[in-house]
Amino acid sequence: MTAVSCGDLIEVVYTPDMRRKTFHYVLNTPACAPNIALAVGPFEIFVDPYMHEVTHFCLPQLLPSLKVSAKYMHEAFEFYEEILSNRYPYSCYKQVFVDEIDEDINAYATMSILNTNLLHSTAIIDQVYITKKAMAQAIAEQFFGCFISMHNWSDTWLPKGISTYLTGLYAKKCFGNNEYREWIQSELQEVVKYEEQFGGIILDPSQAPAPLPIAANTPAPAPRAPDPGFYFPIKNLHTMSPRYIEVLRKKAHLIMRMLEHRIGQELLLQVFNKQLSLAANAAQQKIESGLWSHMLISTNVFAKAIFTVTGKDMSVFIDQWVRTGGHAKFSLSFVFNRKRNTVELEIRQDTAHQRGIRKYVGPLVVNIQELDGTFKHTLQIEGTMARADITCHSKSRRNKKKKIPLCTGEEVDMDLSAMDDSPVLWIRLDPEMTIMRAVQIEQPDYQWQYQLRHERDVTAQLEAIVALQHHSTPATRLALTDTIENEHCYYKVRLRAAHCLTKVANAMVATWAGPPAMLAIFRKLFGSASCRRIIKQNNFSNFQHYFLQKTIPVAMAGLRNAHGICPPEVLAFLMDLFKYNDNSKNRYSDNYYRAALIEALGATVTPVISVQQGTAITAESLSIDTKAILEEVTRNLNLEKLLPCYKYTVSVACLKVIRILQKFGHLPSNPHIFRAYAAYGQFIDVRIAALEALVDFTRVDGKWEDLEFLLDMAEMDPHPGIRHRLVRLMVENPPFERAHKHRLDRPDLVDRIWNLINGMLSHDAKLRCDLVDLYYTLYGTKVPFCLPIPELATIMKPRKAGPPSPEREIKPVPVQHVKHETIDEIENSPAPNKRKSSPNRDPTGPPNSAEHGTEIKRQKIASNQDERGIPIPGEGKVKSEYYSDNSASLPGIMGTPGPVGFEPGMFKKDLEEHKPKSDSVNKSKKKKKDKKKHKHKHKHKHDHKHNKEKEKEKKEKDKGKDKEKDNKKDKDSSALKIKDETLSSASSSQSPEPTVTNEFLFP
């Protein structure tokens, strides 16, 4: 066993019997306590051949994969040291790969603990991008995150944002500018989507932004409605939703990039250099010097550093984007004025009042591509509506000129026959993504087609593809087809174009002529020369073709004919791909390709057209196509057990297809196969796929036992990553919709989640916050739908003014048959107005009537220990305001304030005071109640309660006598009496003789 910790290894000391050893590490650089780590295991050790200060540790038999995965890691060190003009701040660096951790990367001082699943061999393609970026992120966090750490919780955006920004620069160097810009665009879209769903993310909530300056003669702006905020505190990392933290990192990265555009990349890197230099100097001093504060970074320190280096005051920027949440949302439309040769632009911010969206005031860049080139215009946006007349530099020469200069300087030939008289080819808003924004541009379909074909920016091409989904025309079909075939086009644009063509083809199904979309393209690219139907042997040396070969079959599987089913030619084509798949001479693994083919089979499945109710699904009842799909999936799933592939990607795809077949009625809906694959010991990706299917099954067909299975696993599974991922799956696909009656919506569920949140997960803040998200998804911030509303009980049953009753019904120990008895008793009761009492703590008290004055009411309580049990949380019919010290109320279910805990003298033992005169008092009270026609009746355990309907019809005198008789019966049998507003006990059997009698006295 080897122990790995922070700092330099000084010595290893063995005990005399050589059975134990002690590792001594020394860290000479000051470090925060959370940045100290320890990893112990039977590690294999590999010293980096390029940088001897770097050591790698992995579990047994993974050393070959480790050498491949970390082969180019030294380049990241060199890149960071070069752009930051600073040496790596520590004397060594250790990478430890371990199993069963929650996060893929965990950075600590001088060491990082990474997930074993990041390792890969030379035969794997897809994982390389993920692993390289993850290792680069871990190294970047050594500079900002470990060496320079946050000053307060609210400053966490700085180390997260700076380290991710540096990782992005390295990714741009490794994978190219197109990959980098597509990554930035996807992060921006993710932040926008999250903020519009939940609210604006405030990166630094510790200080409110400064108020905007207002001129003396300018009227004050109308105050904006206060943001309701999130359903969790955002000032501490241990209370934030894990999803919120994930999106906060992305937003912090984007804000750093915005800062780069405002002060320049070189100056921003100088700011980082200054902070590192000050910290490196402070690290060599003793704590008495008072310089260690330079090793902490805060928003104010960062703003001052920018001012020191650049001379620019960025306080307005900080207030606008760091201390204020939300993003801008623009809608752009334009009209070409032929007479004046101008473009009349209109930019609206109509949705500025909606959640997560705010009004933007400031400069906004608009790029107009004209016949004579690209022209950049900067508009000043001040209100929610901005108009501008922009003079065009070129006139419409549709048939005179075809060489069009682009923003890159190159000239391209364009077919201008689709144009009208406008010289505008397309318009872009904020093309460099320099602000947090969402953009909607209204322009004709031919302009989107020009933008897709000829714009060189990948983000513009991706925007055009999204827009063309809504323009299903032959011209759009041709533009998308040309994009898929264009070898000079970025591969991710080609993949998106394939999926877009699927939607366009389905919309054009009535007029579509020829073979299914993309079939000819695939056979042209990958079919053998002699017979196009037979696919060539796999050769993944061209990565663009590899990703196309994976994606086109999945896109084609989404095609539908006029009847709404997948064309038979497509299914036959997919079966041929399985049949002729030959990877024998390929240097790369085809596991991701085979998984994609299985995913494509699942995408061809459509719901069963007609099914007779009650007919069992058998092998004979399956259609020929479904049987072929099922046989192929089963064959691959069984083959995986004999010849497992990297990360079991084929098994993951098979499980997803089996769930699709179940969901669409081709297979019996059964969770047992998924439970087997979700068991501890299976590979984590297989478990997650099985759990995803189980979560979906629970939502569609699940019973209470299925939901309990998921909750048990989320609470007790040994793998922390599985616990977290399972709850996230339940948040994304909840077992039922909020505010709708559902068979799974029970008080038991409310109690279980609530108790986990409040008392059981103090050691695991991440899982606790996951469950907070789940609770919010199911119930929001209001009373759960399965719990009766306390106010409704008050309205239905008027009560006497007075202090809350300390009575509390005592429920027997929970047994399954007791629940059935309770249900039977309620169903058999002749009283039509009975309703189930609230399982939460309702404000209770005597009936609210001024006539009753200050009469003393005494209730006799049987306290037989055999009848008593532990009340089930959420099910016990609690009518008291006396809680235990550890109790916690559900949000929105607060009763009338009263004493908390048990007070001295609250329960007074008096066995002799319960005299008949108290019965006469009760008799006179009930006469008055009957005069006012109140419907309050004591609910007893005995058969006399079935006479209550007859009692309504009797005269007042008879009623009083009946009540007196009832009270005598209760006294003789010593039955448990319940307050007016509660139901009878769950037990329908007669109570045994009481051992103790308690009196409750009300003033």
Where on the chain are the PLM-derived regions?
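Extended, charge-dense intrinsically disordered regions
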Residues: K819-P1003
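HEAT/HEAT-like alpha-solenoid repeats
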Residues: D445-W448, T476-I484, W512-A529, P568-Y580, ...
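Non-catalytic accessory/interaction domains
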Residues: M1-K21, N28, P60, A140, ...
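Extended alpha-helical scaffolding segments
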Residues: A689, V695-P788
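Residue-level detector of extended alpha-helical repeat arrays and alpha-solenoid scaffolds
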Residues: V458-Q461, Y490-L495, H545, Q549, ...
